[in-house]
A protein has these predicted regions:
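Glycine-rich nucleophile elbow surrounding the catalytic serine of serine-hydrolase chemistry
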Residues: 185-195
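Accessory cap/linker subdomain of secreted extracellular hydrolases
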Residues: 82, 94-97, 101-107, 113, ...
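Alpha/beta-hydrolase fold nucleophile elbow
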Residues: 175-187
């Protein structure tokens, strides 16, 4: 059965405030009082350890909510998760912190206010996580998911599905949870959310890939309809694609030094001359140059081709003005609709830039006004109720929603 949630702009002026949906203000002081942070290095099946920050509600707050335990909300990312308390070489640290990541007070605030366990994890090879980072690592686990370990020529095969599977196994055994896991993320984390669904871990009850990086040749990030996007591929890649020689908490800076206008810089030389500026240190840049056509290299990195017989509910979210991953959201939705007829499939789309729905006060794009707090509406009335229903059995089953341009008339239909 298909369900579509379409959030089409010009939102109502009186939507959710900066409070969490249950009225709780989630800030550093509140989090320090009601949550603890544990940092651990979770061992994967090939022996590598993945940095994981676990935010858990204190028992008193759970009792206040009338709960014995809450679900786990998992967020996996290649970007920094400061503040880091764990040092390279340490396995675990625990305690309270005075300053929490912005996401805990932003798009995760509703989950924190309801006593959920919030888990933030650096993917393999990024920051403190061990192993080699591979951009858009190909899915190798197969149609049955990542439960079984595959060994080829003595080497344990891993991908982002096996890593999320192993992480959830550890989390279920080492946190006080209700046995249910949700996964969400925007952009790269959207890609990892798709791979989480492909892991087919039985504890994952719902997932929301949002602007998921999906097909890096046909429409996402580095290419748009096969045309190389230099802003993403070159400038962004000049720092992000850099090899991290050992785990560390520091962001690697750009190796590209440009002392003039970017537009002029790109127009003033053929593509091959960029190698002189980038050197030979960016493995993925070199791979892009070696694969200028839509070949197996790119197709292997598209997880949407594997979205067959997905059983868990999926909320796919995208923005009409997303310059990075507009393609990925609608491609993911299309493939799920085509290949997973039993998936309870939802779509949320609006007039947002890349990840704009995570900005609670989002109300415009440049000079185009599209209404008050559309991000807050999405978080409070679309995303959180979706996960709350499937992970805690609260609320009503999501239905198709149309928001009229004036915001004065709203109707729900099956």
């Amino acid at each position: 059965m298909k369900r579509i949630i379409t959030v089409i702009a010009l939102m109502m002026s009186a939507l959710a405030s900066a409070f969490a949906q249950n009225g709780q203000i989630v800030d550093d002081n509140w989090l320090t009082e009601n949550y603890t942070r544990r940092e651990v290095m979770i061992e994967m099946r090939d022996g590598k350890h993945i940095y994981t920050a676990i935010y858990e509600p204190v028992q008193q707050y759970l009792e206040k909510l009338g709960k014995k335990a809450g679900p786990i909300m998992l967020f996996r990312t290649p970007y920094g998760l400061k503040p880091y308390g764990l040092k390279p070489g340490q396995i675990e640290t625990e305690g309270k912190v005075e300053k929490y990541p912005g996401g805990m007070k932003g798009d995760m605030a509703n989950y924190a206010a309801e006593g959920w366990i919030i888990v933030q994890q650096n993917v393999r090879g990024k920051f403190l996580s061990e192993g080699e980072y591979e951009n858009m690592r190909p899915y190798v686990s197969g149609p049955d998911g990542a439960a079984d370990t595959v060994v080829v020529k003595g080497v344990v095969q891993v991908d982002d599905a096996t890593d999320v599977y192993d992480s959830i196994e550890w989390l279920l055994k080492n946190t006080k949870n209700n046995g249910n896991v949700g996964v969400k993320g925007v952009s790269y984390p959207g890609f990892y959310t798709t791979l989480a669904a492909l892991s087919r871990h039985p504890a994952i009850k719902a997932a929301s890939p949002q602007a998921p990086a999906t097909d890096w040749f046909m429409g996402d990030d580095a290419h748009h309809n096969g045309a190389l996007c230099l802003a993403d591929a070159c400038r962004f890649g000049s720092s992000f694609y850099r090899h991290r020689p050992c785990p560390s908490t520091e962001r690697l800076g750009s190796i590209l030094k440009i002392d003039k206008d970017l537009y002029e810089f790109y127009l003033g030389r053929p593509l091959k001359e960029l190698d002189a500026f980038l050197g030979d240190s960016l493995r993925f840049w070199n791979q892009m140059m070696e694969h200028p056509d839509y070949d197996r290299f790119w197709k292997d990195r598209d997880p949407s081709a594997h979205l067959k017989n997905i059983k868990i509910p999926m909320l796919v979210t995208g923005g009409f003005y997303d310059a990075e991953d507009c393609y990925g959201a609608f491609r993911t939705y299309e493939m799920l609709k085509t290949m997973s007829p039993d998936c309870e499939l939802y779509l949320a789309a609006g007039p947002w830039y890349h990840g704009g729905w995570n900005n609670r006060t989002a109300n415009h794009l440049a000079d185009v006004w599209y209404g008050e707090k559309s991000g807050a509406y999405y978080q409070d009335d679309v995303e959180f109720p979706f996960f709350s229903y499937y992970l805690e059995g609260k609320g009503v089953k999501p239905v198709r929603v149309n928001v009229c341009p004036s915001g004065e008339s709203m109707r729900s239909v099956m």
